[in-house]
Amino acid sequence: MTNNYNLGYACINTELSSRKVKVSTNRTMRRKTFDEKGLDYVSEIILQNVTDLLAILKWNADNDIHFFRMSSEMFPWASEYALEDLKDFDKIEEALFKAGLFAEENDIRLTTHPGPFNKLCSPNEQVVLNTIKDLEIHGRMMDLLCQPRSPWAKINIHVGGAYNDKPMALANFCKNFKRLSDAVKTRLTVENDDKESLYSTQELYDGVYKVIGIPIVHDYHHHTMCTGGLTQQEAVELALTTWGD
């Protein structure tokens, strides 16, 4: 019997990260360390992270796992520098190319889920600018991995807040979406929330998908706390319609 689903996991491979020689893409640092040790140290950390990404993908392939959500911590403090300024950029670029090629050759889907501080819907322009910057970093990472500019290589986020005015927040999200580069716009997806004060799959369909056409990622667990009046099956089927073929 052929399965029509694809199981995977997010960010941390507990098998590899617990070994004596740790394999991980989550090496990071505190701000104090970043300020004290500078870009050369950051460059070394990033090179370790992206090199280990390939090792993790090889383990995944060996264990018949073909879906992997990459860590957003692969590039510590990435908003503070341009990747090209890193001393190891050429090696980092090569490592990402190799990882992306391996993923393609082994039918492994790579995705990301930037953190909750990303709020395209915010009425605060600085918050929006910070969000755009972070999303563009994820878009650049996907490009360096040679991933398709499509939701297959999704950059998945939440709307980010309601600000006591859901229509306003949804309109802001859609307006600010248009400020993103194609590297992000073509990959962006939006996920339902786990609080009734935020956004159900139905609300995302009406307020986001119908306006800008980006696919909805339906979280089964979140839906139990924010149904929007739909059953689980109805919400899943509604989200599926946003993905086309």
Predicted regions and their residues:
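Short acidic, Gly/Ser-rich segments with clustered Asp/Glu that frequently serve as metal-coordination loops
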Residues: 221-227
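Active-site segment flanking the S-adenosylmethionine/decSAM binding pocket
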Residues: 209-215, 221
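Alpha/beta catalytic barrel-like cores
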Residues: 1-109, 118-132, 136-147, 151, ...
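Conserved, mostly hydrophobic/aromatic
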Residues: 113, 219
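Short, glycine/acidic-enriched loop or turn micro-motifs at the edges of active sites
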Residues: 116, 194, 222
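Glycine-rich phosphate-binding "P-loop"
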Residues: 153-167
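Active-site glycine-rich loop that binds ribose-phosphate moieties when present
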Residues: 137, 164-179, 195-199
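Catalytic beta/alpha-barrel core
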Residues: 156, 187-194, 215-217
